[in-house]
Amino acid sequence: MKEKKTGEKKKKFREGQEKQILSDLFFDFIDIAERLKPKIIVAENVKGIIAGNAKGYVNAIIKRLDEIGYNTQIFLLNAATMGVPQRRERVFFLARRKDLHLEPISLSFNEKPIYYKEFVDKKYKKMNEDTMTYKRWLKRINKDSSLGDTVKRTENGKLSGFTSNYCKLNEVPHTITAGGQIIRFDVPGTLSDKDITTIQSFPQDYDYNGQSVQYVCGMSVPPLMMAKVAEQIKIQWLDKL
């Protein structure tokens, strides 16, 4: 086995969550790696894992990997710089087995941003004009990044709607989340499944097996993002063994 990859319990480290609940899952994963002894270990998690109280958890992870014979590097990567039409920041743990004497890996991605207007689907899920969401959407202005911004600005500072991001034609789309709404700024509606699939870099013929497209994509790492990391692991590490 050349490498082992995991996306540890993301819900434990949601961005914006005040209290980070630490899980033993990552350490269970490391215990398995200790038995399998792969050349390379790759783990992925949300940005929140390197923020606040979770920093101590990260240090414990690095220490445990060191104890089982691995040197670990941590990278905060943005999918938008990796050929993915989405501003999705994720933390990657890359660990190499010490006995292989591999040099540290360097990850630097600077691909051209892909804006929503470059692939926008003409179809979308129309809003019900009788809903509060539609009435609030009508009050949007260019500087609003989410429905929450619109609500706060027009409803005396009320804090609501911040999980409903606007998708603007001249911007790289926000992170696809498993919940909330992804609202089009240009027309009164939410993103089509085709758009969500494109933004997540999934193939258009992907079989979601009846599950919500937004939920599946929101819980996944963009395949193209993973491919870019894997490519560098091959070039900088595996090809040198």
Question: Whereabouts are the PLM-identified features?
Answer:
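Conserved active-site and SAM-binding loop architecture
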Residues: 1-241
